[in-house]
Curated annotation (Swiss-Prot):
Subcellular location: Cytoplasm
Annotated family: Belongs to the class-I aminoacyl-tRNA synthetase family.
Name of this protein: Cysteine--tRNA ligase
Entry keyword annotation includes Zinc: yes
Binding site for ATP: K275
Species: Dinoroseobacter shibae (strain DSM 16493 / NCIMB 14021 / DFL 12)
Keywords, comma-separated and alphabetical: Aminoacyl-tRNA synthetase, ATP-binding, Cytoplasm, Ligase, Metal-binding, Nucleotide-binding, Protein biosynthesis, Zinc
Co-factor requirement: Zn(2+)
Length: 458
């Protein structure tokens, strides 16, 4: 396999395939972004990092000027309406603030700005036009002020998730409404009562359903056919299934998305993240606790996008130690002209980021620091923008220093330095520089500092 032969697992075909762009001069990717009503939690960040990594690889293979990446912002949604009602704030105030938070937090994780970040509310005319086309083609109908997609009118519905419509009805929680012809039919447009966001349309004042937003924005910015559509696997059904139905029925001459990619979900310490378990936290929570964005990114990249990812404190501490060691090693080094072939080979093999990280470790062991720096920077690591945190680790060693001083004081009296030596050895093994003088004890985290190993200090 050559370095430029990119292979990706296509959810639609359930196979790993050689990626052949529709137009190598204009490689196009659409990724479903956040619904902006609150801070992004750690799970929201995973697709942002995964598809940022793919964006970087596509830019490396085809050239930065030949790749277009669209990641939308959903700023019209019932969750946003509910938050506005709870807080008494305007919807625009909430969506502007939370969009800003999201972009700041994702930038802190080293994600490059997408080519386009469209807000759904800026594309209402395109949504209305697409809905009109679907009605005219016999794929949608008006009922009680709603416009609904007629799922039975699209024979290929269910192909992405591999389920028949009847199976879906049996196994899914579908919204039952008297105006639906079929339980699986979904809303394209719904009426808005006073006090809710609404736009004039042929069907009265209302707002779009969730699924039509992405179909309209991707069509407007990328065309009837484009290369890659990505998102979390929780979006595979119904969101992506519905997008395919809408887009292929509105524009049957196009192919919509050629390759579909889905990242797996995130857990915390082996359990699903939830507020009830007390293990729910946002990206900003971690950043405010002093966990560098680069460390969060490194932990994310340590698991293949197709596997469930487990965020643990141990992984966080290990990532911090590795990055601190690498940053100390490459200080003053100029990066090689390109990433190491071994790292690139892993990345073009279905975005094998854990394999690429293993190759970074090998480059470090081999002393190939220019190669390490260039390769890590391709992966969004070891850049100047992501640095600064490593010079003064966010750790308080004052209690350990006081304890060692106490043990040392006792040892001077008994002439038995066994415990002093044991503590000192454990601290050094954890990457801590131990400085003892008449003035007292000073503990300084070194480049290989690993907080996880402090547990061994007795």
């Amino acid at each position: 396999m050559t370095a430029t032969e990119l292979k990706l697992t296509n959810t639609k075909t359930r196979r790993k395939e050689v990626f052949t762009p529709i137009d190598p001069d204009n490689v196009r990717m659409y990724v479903c972004g956040p619904t902006v009503y609150d801070r992004a939690h750690l799970g929201n960040a995973r697709p942002a990092v995964v598809f940022d990594m793919l964006f970087r690889v596509l830019r490396e293979v085809y050239g930065p000027e030949h790749v277009t990446y669209v990641r939308n912002i959903t700023d019209v949604d019932d969750k946003i309406n509910a938050r506005a009602a709870e807080t008494g704030r305007s919807i625009r105030e909430i969506t502007d603030e939370t969009t800003g938070w999201y972009l700041e937090d994702m930038a802190a994780l080293g994600t490059l700005p997408p080519t386009h970040v469209p807000r759904a509310t800026e594309y209402i005319p395109q949504m209305v036009a697409m809905i009109e086309t679907l009605i005219a083609r016999g794929h949608a109908y008006v009922a009680e002020g709603h416009v609904l997609f007629d799922v039975r009118s699209y024979g290929a519905y269910g192909a992405l998730s591999g389920r028949s419509v009847d199976d879906m009805i049996a196994g899914a929680r579908v919204e039952v409404a008297p105006y639906k012809r079929d339980p699986m039919d979904f809303v394209l447009w719904k009426p808005s009562e006073a006090g809710l966001p609404g736009w004039d349309s042929p069907w009265g004042r209302g707002r779009p359903g969730w699924h039509i937003e992405c179909s309209a924005m991707s069509h407007e910015l990328l065309g009837e056919s484009f290369d890659i559509h990505g998102g979390g696997n929780d979006l595979q059904f119904p969101h992506h299934e519905n997008e395919i139905a809408q887009s292929c029925c509105a524009h049957p001459e196009g192919g919509f998305a050629k390759v579909w990619m889905h990242n797996e979900m995130l857990q915390v310490e082996g359990k699903k993240m939830s507020k009830s378990l007390g293990n729910f936290f946002t990206v900003r929570d971690l950043l405010d606790q002093g966990v560098p964005g680069e460390v969060i990114r490194f932990v994310f990249l340590g698991t293949h996008y197709s596997k469930p990812m487990d965020w643990t404190e141990r992984k966080r501490d290990e990532a911090m130690a590795v990055l601190r060691k690498w940053r100390a090693a490459v200080a003053g080094t100029r990066p090689a002209p390109a990433a190491a072939p071994s790292v690139m080979a892993a990345l073009v093999d279905d975005l094998n980021t854990p394999g690429a990280i293993a190759e970074l470790h090998q480059l470090y062991r081999d002393g190939n620091l220019p190669g390490l720096l260039a390769s890590a920077q391709l992966m969004g690591l070891l850049s100047d923008e992501m640095g600064g945190w490593d010079s003064s680790p966010q750790v308080d060693l004052s209690e350990l220093a006081a304890r060692l001083a106490e043990v040392r004081e006792a040892a001077i009296g008994t002439k038995d330095f066994t415990q002093v030596d044991r503590m000192k050895a454990a601290l050094i093994a954890a990457g801590v520089e131990v400085r003892m003088s008449k003035a007292g004890v000073e503990l300084v985290p070194g480049p290989e500092f690993d907080a996880a190993k402090l547990e061994a200090v007795e």
